[in-house]
Amino acid sequence: GDDFLIEKVRNYYADKYSIPVVPIDRKDKDARAIIITSYLDLVAQIVERNWQEHIQRLVQDSEYRENFFQLLPDTAFWQREWQTHSASSSQMELTEWAKQQFQPGSIDVNIMTKLDKKNTSNGEELPVEYNDAHAILRGFALSKLNSSVVLSAGMNPLLFSYMQKFADFFPGNDGNFRKKIIVKVSDYRSALVQGKMLAKKGLWVSEFRIESGLNCGGHAFPTQGHLMGPILEEFKQKRT
């Protein structure tokens, strides 16, 4: 299955970056969730390593820095900013400034909520938390990521309820979320229904990601073939 592929990818990149990993027993009834968690943590580790190397090269390698600035939308602005800070800052201060300006992106995870097949072990059906989508959600929730889960392809009330079990989906003492919820929707009605369903469980939707029903299927409600313009207008008129 896809979890087997993910494990192969994890081993490939662990070997490429010389990162030791612990083999996962695929006979473990929770292997799917463990594989997801281990893979996501590895991705986070690699991103962190590459980001640190990127910052170091920005500070120390002028050719690398100039090539990077050329990739940014406002090249001249960043060239001026760099000249201003480099003229009055130590290398350590410049490194800290660069870290603040050039943060790595969020490692988000997409879950197709309806792909939630039941699983068995030794011929016996496992509890619902071992269903495919439930296991993926658990794998994400238990990872070290500070990012978002994107719920797509319709509603799964059981999965929504299961999200309540993980503290990272709720705000911490500082009011921030370690794990945010993004819901893909095709129209306002879908956003309203799913948003209310999650709100009743105490779960906050950080973003509704709108996709036209003309170029994607499998959403909670079939659309009438409306284009994106009228869909966005309805959100604009009815948002509170």
Question: Which residue ranges define each predicted feature?
Answer:
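Active-site-adjacent beta->alpha loops and helix N-cap segments on the catalytic face
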Residues: A133, N156-P171, D187-A191, P222-Q224
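Gly-rich Lys/Arg/Thr-decorated short loops/hinges at beta-loop-alpha junctions or inter-strand turns
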Residues: T113-S121, S143-L145, G175-N176, G218-L232
